Amino acid sequence: MGYPKEGETIQIHSYKHNGLIHRIWNETTILKSTEMCVIGANDRTMVTESDGRTWITREPAICYFHARQWFNVIGMLREDGVHYYCNISSPFAYDGEAIKYIDYDLDVKVFPDMTYNILDEDEYDDHRKAMNYPKEIDSILRDYLNTLLHWIHQRQGPFAPEFVDMWYERYLRYTK
């Protein structure tokens, strides 16, 4: 599979289970990259939706991908603290130009005080039926939703108190 080089700027591609593109983030700077984990950052990057619409992200974000976890985490730096958006997804793959993963609709929005909301459960159920997610996938996704919630409660990995600030400081070195 390989993995991107630190300092490299790459795209992030999100797909749906049926193989169709869901969303593309145009530019993310790689801050750490190993076979197991990729950490990237972006700020005001263009995002292209599956229907061709585009928009620009509003704030700096630290992106966390793991090769064995069925979720990814985006920590967004806002005036009132770090907000997290977590996608229940396949583990990432890297093809030499982009980090790629399958977005499985379930999301968790985490606030600076570490309270959270689970989002899009109806969309998940609709897509699970429409795209015939195998029972094994459904079971894996539900297990990893619980793993993600455990990480949030324990402030593990990207939810550790200084994680996002530390990686944002490193990102600033690349933007000078």
UniProtKB/Swiss-Prot annotation:
Binding positions (Mg(2+) 2): 105, 107, 120, 123
E.C. number: 3.6.1.15, 3.6.1.6
Signal peptide: none
Catalytic residue list: 23
Gene3D superfamilies: FomD-like
Positions annotated to bind Mg(2+) 1: 87, 103, 107
Cofactor: Mg(2+)
Positions of disulphide bridges: none
Molecular function, one GO term: ribonucleoside triphosphate phosphatase activity
Main function: Has nucleoside phosphatase activity towards nucleoside triphosphates and nucleoside diphosphates.
Xref: HAMAP family: Ntdp
This protein's name: Nucleoside triphosphate/diphosphate phosphatase
Annotated source species: Bacillus subtilis (strain 168)
